[in-house]
Amino acid sequence: MEHHKPLLPTSSHAAPNPRTRKDLLLLLCALLFLSSLVAFGRNRASNVPHDHVSSSASNHQQEHQSPTSLPSSKWHAVSRGVSSGVSEKSSSMLFSGEGGASEAFPWDNSMLSWQRTSFHFQPEKNWMNDPNGPMYYKGWYHFFYQYNPNGAVWGDIVWGHAVSRDMIHWLHLPLAMVADQWYDKQGVWTGSATILPNGEIIMLYTGSTNESVQVQNLAYPADPSDPLLVDWIKHPGNPVLVPPPGIGAKDFRDPTTAWLTSEGKWRITIGSKLNKTGIALVYDTDDFKTYELKNGHLRAVPGTGMWECVDFFPVSKKNENGLDTSLSINGAEVKYVMKVSLDDDRHDYYTIGTYDENKVLFTPDDVKNDVGVGLRYDYGIFYASKTFYDQNMDRRILWGWIGESDSEYADVTKGWASVQSIPRTVRLDKKTGSNLLQWPVAEVESLRLRSDEFKSLKAKPGSVVSLDIETATQLDVVAEFEIDAESLQKTAQSNEEFTCSTSGGAAQRGALGPFGLLVLADEGLSEYTPVYFYVIKGRNGNLKTSFCSDQSRSSQPNDVRKQIFGNIVPVLEGEKFSLRMLVDHSIVESFAQGGRTCVTSRVYPTKAIYGAARLFLFNNATEATVTASLKIWQMNSAFIRPFPFNPDQKN
C-alpha cells in the first residue's frame, strides 16, 4: 500500500533515552522501570507502513544465534595515547570527556558477533589502527598496520602484516616488527615503504623511544628474495632522524614514501607543528641513513595543529593511471596532492596544487581549500590514511583506518576493535579539476553474488518504500536518482543554508530533499541509517547538493556515538544524483557522484541484524517526487585467515 508518512524526528521512533542527568538521577531512576515498559510497548507496536517492492522472490531467514546477554556494567574511561603525544585513542573518553564511569549497554553475543565484518580487512583479534607501508612486491600485495597483540585497546603497538593477491582475500603473517629496541620501546609507530628503481625496499617508521621521544628509523627485508617479506632487519644505526631544534619531542612522526628529485636525491616529508601551526618538514637523502633538513616547510597552515600521517603524491591531469613517486615527475600535465591527518579533530584533509622542487614548496590551487581546512578524503570515520603506487595495475591505492563508534567496554567484550576501508583507487576528477575521485578497487566486485534490480521506482514526497531483497547485511548497492522536472521548476528559490552535521538529519524536510536509502533498518523502522542527498535551489536558480549519512537513529543503545556526517558534493549539468554503497555488517562506505564525496559510517543496530536487516528507498522531501533506479548485489565473504605455512617454512 502507498505510504506518505515522512520520517520523523528521533523522539518519534526511538525509545526514551535511559541516560540521566546527574541532578535528576534520583527522580529518573524512580521512573526508569515505567519508561522502559512504555518504550517496550512502543517498539512492539511500531509498524510504520511502507510500500513493498520486489524484483524477485525474497527470502528473509532469521539467522540470530541464541542470545546470551552480557551483564550491564559500569565502565571507567581510561585515557590512551595522549601521554605519548598522540590523540585520544579511547572511545570511552570521547564519550565522557573525563574518567568517570559510564553505563554500558548489555550487548548479547549475537549482537556483538554480527558486528564483525565479512569482507573488510581486520586481524583475527585485538586492536588495529593506522595502515602502514602498503606495497606490491613479487606478486603479493603487502599490508602492514598498527597492532596491539595484547588486547582490543590502543597500546603496545607493533606492526601486523598480511599479504594478498587481490587486496580482498588476505593471509595473516607473523608480526613484522616489534618494540624490542630503545628507539621504539614505547611503540613501533606509523611508517611508509619506498621501492627503489632497482627493486630494493626501504621502510621508514616512527619509533617512540624509552623516553617517549619520537624518532625516525630505517628497516629493510632480511631476505629480499622472499616474496612474503616475513623477516625484517632494523638498521644498526637507528635512529636515522631525531626531532630538529625547535620541534617538540612528541611532535615529529610518520615519514612519507620518498619521491625522487631531478638531482637524483630522495625526498621525504614528516608531520609536525609549531605552536598551533601544522607543518610538513622536508628532508633529502642519498642513502636513507643520513639526511639534510631543507629550509622552510613543504606547507604550513596556522590553526591546524599537529599534522600526522602526511601523504604527498602526483596525479595526472590527462590519464586515469597512477603515477610512480620513484620517478622524477613534474610538469604541466601533473598536479600534486597533499594530505594531512589532523591530530586535533581526527580527520584526513587534502588539497590539490603545484609543487616547486627547487623552492621545496607546495602551493594549493585554492587557498580556501588549503590542507587542513578544506576538502576531506572522507566525511565520516576515516583517518591516518596512506596511499601507494600499485605498479602491478598502474594505479594509486588509498587505505584508511576505520575506528569504532561504540564503547571501549563493547570492544573489549567482543575482543577486537577497528577495520580498514576497502582499498580505493584515487585519481583527479577531470571534469572539475578541483577534487579527487575515490572508488572501491575493482577486485571487490569478485565478491558479488546474486543481484536484484529496480528500475524507475517513484517515491512521492514523504514516502518510504521497502526494497525486498534476500538479506541486507552484506551489500554492494549502485543507485541513481532524478527529481521530477516539474518540482524543480515550481520550487521557490531560497537562501536556506544546510550542513549535514548540524542539521536534523534525514528527518529535516526541505522542498527537494532529503532522499536516498535507509540501510540496516528493521521492519518497524525503530533502527535505520539514512544515506541521502539534500538539495537546495539557491537564489540564482542553481542547485546545491549535500551528501549525508545519518547515524542518529542507527542504534537504540546509548553507549554508541550517533553522528551525522557529510558535505557538499558537486553535481554537474546533465548528471543524475548517483551513489554507491558497500554495506558490511557494522560498516557502511558510501560514494557520491563517482567518488567526489565519500562518507564512511560505523553502525551498531540491535534489531536490524542478520535476517531482520532491511533496505528501504525513502523520499522525505515536501514537494519533489523522486525516481530511483537501483542494482543491489549480495556480497560474499572474503577469505581472511593465517597464511598456511608448510612445515619447513616459518611459523
Swiss-Prot record:
Pathway: Glycan biosynthesis; sucrose metabolism. May be present in two forms, a 70 kDa monomer and a heterodimer of the 30 kDa and 38 kDa subunits. The ratio of the levels of the two forms within cells appears to be regulated developmentally. InterPro entries: Beta-fructofuranosidase_N (IPR021792), ConA-like_dom_sf (IPR013320), Fructan_Metab_Enzymes (IPR050551), Glyco_hydro_32 (IPR001362), Glyco_hydro_32_AS (IPR018053), Glyco_hydro_32_C (IPR013189), Glyco_hydro_32_N (IPR013148), Glyco_hydro_beta-prop_sf (IPR023296). It is a single-pass type II membrane protein. One of its GO terms (molecular function) is beta-fructofuranosidase activity. Residues 1-103 form a propeptide. This is Acid beta-fructofuranosidase. It comes from the Eukaryota. It catalyses: Hydrolysis of terminal non-reducing beta-D-fructofuranoside residues in beta-D-fructofuranosides. It is an enzyme of class 3 (hydrolase). It is found in: Membrane; Vacuole lumen.
